[in-house]
């Protein structure tokens, strides 16, 4: 089964579709590691791997591509690794956690893309809460640096 979505970004150009299927070996922005009942989910965004052209993902800022990988990792943690009791989210960058949603990506996006980006981002965060409440996986965010006002809202 393939999951694709018609792109609603003016920056998408010839891309046309956004592929929501990914796996840990394809991640460009996250690293996932395990040690017993503890998993580490490390955010280290590839600045030059934005979903569309026209912007860089500086300072661990995120776009839909970053969130697609996060959503995939969260589902895998929940359903493929029920032995995990604690997930530690942290940055792979020194002195910077996350700058928030990428402003240049948002500036180049259509209204529909912005709305769907926000919906997907919110549902991904809701998945963290649901995992904590219903699967027994607790999430900790280890911040060693700056996080922008609009940085990941990890409400775990």
Which residue ranges define each predicted feature?
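Conserved CoA-thioester-binding segment of acyl-CoA-metabolizing enzymes
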Residues: 2-88
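Histidine (H) residue identity feature
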Residues: 29, 81, 111-113, 151, ...
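A structural preference for short, pocket-lining loop segments at secondary-structure junctions
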Residues: 36-44, 63-112, 122-142
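Short acidic, gly/pro-rich beta-turn/loop elements at beta-sheet edges
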Residues: 51, 99, 151
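Surface-exposed beta-strand edges and their flanking turn/coil or helix-capping segments
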Residues: 53-56, 102, 154-155
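A glycine-rich helix N-cap at a beta->alpha junction
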Residues: 114-118
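Gly/Ser-rich catalytic serine loop of serine hydrolases
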Residues: 141-154
